[in-house]
Amino acid sequence: MALKSYNPTSPGQRGLILVDKSALWKGKPVKALTEGKRKTGGRNNKGHVTSRGIAGGHKQKYRFIDFKRRKWDVPATVERLEYDPNRTAFIALVKYEDGELAYILAPQRLAVGDTIVAGKKTDVKPGNAMELAQMPVGTIVHNIEMKPGKGGQIARSAGTYAQVVGRDRGLVIVRLGSGEQRYIRGECMGTVGAVSNPDNQNTNLGKAGRNRWLGKRPLTRGVAKNPVDHPHGGGEGRTSGGRHPVTPWGKPTKGARTRHNKSTDKMIIRSRHAKKKR
């Protein structure tokens, strides 16, 4: 879908660039596939802030998305493409031959009226889901499981995809968007194609209020705070912090490695940081 730019009739309109959603469904979602969603304001059950920068935002309904695609060998027709406020990608309402309705992540080049199917092995066509072991090398794939039956976890946001680059001892080698290459079990499911709405990254919200509509609060820089509030705080006049970037709790940030999982280290063939090393 194309991008829309607006005439500068106000400061908020100047520079505003949004994705054109005219081809999406304009009605309400399927009631049986939605549920209410309560705002947390970034607080836990004790009322303590556990995730900063969250507050307000437009009221949303949660859409149940089928990330597992375990209804095998039953063709489904794409009824419509819809907007989903809970994610950057668009979603597709599909109707199976037995009458069941479901929402799936809409891949690029999926249109209303198309027929899709999930199974152990299917045609390599956008929207079809199958086991990674059955996909030809070079296939573009999204919504990839990391454990069989758990549901897709990799490449789910707008415009993302991974690529099958090889096979080895019952495992499939997949290159992720970050540049990482890793083994994934061949029984894990994946969906052919790249996720819809690739122009999401080229949007410009135009004004701070649009971010507030999304439920995002302003972020205060550490160097603008007092020493009691942040390790970068204080100092006479404007200072640059004087130390490597850290979180308010003193942990290194901005590029510091945080991954600690020895049990799955053996599944990573090439780290996403490999290209950065000199």
Swiss-Prot record:
Described by its record, this protein's role is as follows: One of the primary rRNA binding proteins. Required for association of the 30S and 50S subunits to form the 70S ribosome, for tRNA binding and peptide bond formation. It has been suggested to have peptidyltransferase activity; this is somewhat controversial. Makes several contacts with the 16S rRNA in the 70S ribosome.
GO BP terms in the entry: cytoplasmic translation
Gene Ontology CC annotations of this record: large ribosomal subunit
Instruction: List all Basic residues biased stretches.
Output: 269-278
Gene3D superfamilies in the cross-refs: 2.30.30.30, Nucleic acid-binding proteins, Ribosomal protein L2, domain 3
Q: State the family named in the UniProt similarity comment for this chain.
A: Belongs to the universal ribosomal protein uL2 family.
Q: What species was this sequence derived from?
A: Sphingopyxis alaskensis (strain DSM 13593 / LMG 18877 / RB2256) (Sphingomonas alaskensis)
Q: Report keywords, A-Z.
A: Ribonucleoprotein, Ribosomal protein, RNA-binding, rRNA-binding
Q: Which domain of life is it from?
A: Bacteria
The entry describes its oligomerization and partners as: Part of the 50S ribosomal subunit. Forms a bridge to the 30S subunit in the 70S ribosome.
Source gene?
A: rplB
Q: What is this protein called?
A: Large ribosomal subunit protein uL2
Against Pfam families, the record matches this protein to: Ribosomal_L2 (PF00181), Ribosomal_L2_C (PF03947)
List the SUPFAM superfamilies hit by this protein, alphabetically: Nucleic acid-binding proteins, Translation proteins SH3-like domain
